[in-house]
Amino acid sequence: MKKLLICTLLLAGAFSAYAQGEKEVKTGWSFGLLPTATFSVDNGFQAGAFGDIYNYGDGTTYPDPLHKISWEASYFTKSHRMRLYLAYDSKYLIPGMRINASVTYVNDPLYSFWGYNGPASIQDYDIWYNRETSPNINYYGMSRKMLRGLANVQGRVTDNLNWAAGVNFWKWTLGDMGGANTPYDKNLTLYRRYQKLGAITEAEAKGGIALELNAGLVFDTRDMEAAPNRGVWAEAYLNGNVLNSPYIKACLYFRHYIDIPIHIPAGDPGFAYRLAWQQTRVGETPFYMIQNVPLLVQRNMISEGFGSSNTIRGLRENRVLAEGLAWANTELRVKLVKFKLFNQYFYIAVNPFFDAGVITKPYRADVLGHTAIDPELVFFKGKNDPLSIAGYRGTIYDDSNIKNLIYSAGAGIKIAMNQNFIVSAEYARCFTDGLNADPWIGIGINYQF
């Protein structure tokens, strides 16, 4: 990714910036394609490709496209995760309505499960890093396969106000760590311990299916969608599962984009913030769905719980699992330079940010109690010799930490083509004790919100 950024900066210097008076207009088809050269502490290096395909027609809707197709095919070297994704989005396919649909398949033979209720689940770095000296132990490991198909539609109520409805189908297959070459002890995992404690029920331990229905309202005054300069984007809706384990979630999202009138050649800087809340109001979410963050319009391939580039940056993936979550994201967006190259319009921007959140409704706290331990962790066999973790008492859960504020800060850099295909690289650090994923690096596409 560094090589990509350096090459882009050199090209920007080699080509003169386009004139201030030149009007940016794209017509016809535009293609964005990049290798998925990313890295994360959870999954390792990612190999594959991703991209977007845009159709701008005669250019009258630019910078918003008439049609957008997104796709990804990738594999992660550390977790052996495989991801396949295909999505379509358009406000113009059916006059007066917006259509959003996608199909996603993910195979995670070494998925990390960190426990419930975020700060209450003690993330023991001795266990995590002792995989170097005791390679048969991966305490936080399990496997999961996910197949998802979704379709959402929006229609006009009044100016800037739309109704929205959708359907999401999920099929989950869960189990012990998979793969023929997996060296880990499948009996010594948090996934197995939670089953013994009753925090994961027998009916859901191997996965299940869900059919979610969404319905609500969307208020949108943004000047553009991919990287708004000004406007408000708010959503209020209900999300409910009608199969197996029924539940209803209430979801509220408010995003505000503010143009800062400091005129620089590349464009005015902007300040953006998001306030979000989701909580289960009726029923209980099954284990295989608890990490999900339901959205009306998917901006990224995966939208899951606290601990990702979609919610609070700086945490491990899906580090905070709860029935109710509230969070805020704030960031400054500053364009450094813009230029024209190969008949495409580019800009480079930076975005320092601050994220924070809290648990508003714990998940199965009554089952786990005030504290939970795993006595098998105090002494366990390494690959060759018995290994004792110095000072470890086997505590895996402490509910006195549930209400701790979760907060992080960091910065990112963006490279945008035609204002829509945006490559993003971000670094963040979480300052809540026991939750920091060091290093946390997120490389993908689009602004977070």
Model-predicted segments: where are they?
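Short loop/turn motifs that connect adjacent beta-strands in outer-membrane beta-barrel proteins
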Residues: 20-30, 57-66, 92-99, 156-163, ...
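Residues that define the transmembrane beta-barrel architecture of outer-membrane proteins
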Residues: 29-31, 43-47, 65-67, 80-84, ...
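Gram-negative/organellar outer-membrane beta-barrel architecture
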Residues: 21-31, 39-205, 310, 435-448
